[in-house]
Amino acid sequence: MAQTVVLKVGMSCQGCVGAVNRVLGKMEGVESFDIDIKEQKVTVKGNVEPEAVFQTVSKTGKKTSYWPVEAEAEPKAEADPKVETVTETKTEAETKTEAKVDAKADVEPKAAEAETKPSQV
């Protein structure tokens, strides 16, 4: 059964759009999809399960959530004529670079482990 899945995806550049385009282009059951970087909105149509689409797009490393239902009920403005389906032209190495996640950990010393100096008398 064909259905439409709408996601909010954190995309800030054409590289982000390319990563989402790549994974959706390979996904089985997808008939069409639209990527709107301005609204950070991805609309997927086809014989797909919403959770499967969500998981597939999440694999790009982009922050992904379901599009809010109340926003979907609002009347839609005319589609931007400049929005088009983007074809993948990046090399595999460039794509892998985009998928890397910055893994900086915030490390704070615990109060009990804080360095103390003996008082001088």
Swiss-Prot record:
Induction: Induced by copper deficiency, ozone and senescence. Down-regulated by excess of copper. Its cofactor is Cu cation. Cu cation binds at C13, C16. Residues 2-65 form the HMA domain. GO terms for cellular component: chloroplast; cytosol. InterPro entries: HMA_dom, HMA_dom_sf. Residues 70-121 are annotated as: Disordered. Residues 73-121 have a biased composition (Basic and acidic residues). Disruption phenotype: No visible phenotype under normal growth conditions. Expressed in phloem (at protein level). It holds the Pfam family HMA. GO terms for biological process: copper ion transport; intracellular copper ion homeostasis; response to cadmium ion. Binds 1 copper ion per subunit. Keywords: Acetylation, Chaperone, Copper, Copper transport, Ion transport, Metal-binding, Transport. GO terms for molecular function: copper chaperone activity; metal ion binding; protein domain specific binding. The keyword Oxidoreductase does not apply. The modification N-acetylalanine is found at A2. Belongs to the ATX1 family. Involved in copper homeostasis. Can complement the yeast mutants atx1 and sod1. This is Copper transport protein CCH. The lineage of its organism: Eukaryota, Viridiplantae, Streptophyta, Embryophyta, Tracheophyta. The gene is CCH.
